[in-house]
Amino acid sequence: MKLKITLTKSLIACRVNQIKTAHCLGLKKINNQVIKDDTPAIHGMIKTISHLVVVEKVSDTKEQK
């Protein structure tokens, strides 16, 4: 299973650790989207910036097409 993560709010007024977490996920601008594996480490990162992102589950079959 994979997760599609979309940055929906700005990083301007966020704490440094939240900005670094978003950058580690590959999110730098509003409406950036990344697809990551569903792992505990990614869940921890999402929890840190949960108020800034929208997360959707994506099945692996959609990724292969």
Curated annotation (Swiss-Prot):
GO biological process: translation
GO molecular function: structural constituent of ribosome
InterPro entries according to UniProt: Ribo_uL30_ferredoxin-like_sf (IPR036919), Ribosomal_uL30_bac-type (IPR005996), Ribosomal_uL30_ferredoxin-like (IPR016082)
CDD domains: Ribosomal_L30
Keyword Nucleotide-binding among record annotations: no
Source domain of life: Bacteria
One Gene Ontology CC term in the entry: cytosolic large ribosomal subunit
Keyword vocabulary terms for this entry: Ribonucleoprotein, Ribosomal protein
Family: Belongs to the universal ribosomal protein uL30 family.
Subunit structure: Part of the 50S ribosomal subunit.
Protein name: Large ribosomal subunit protein uL30
Species the sequence originates in: Onion yellows phytoplasma (strain OY-M)
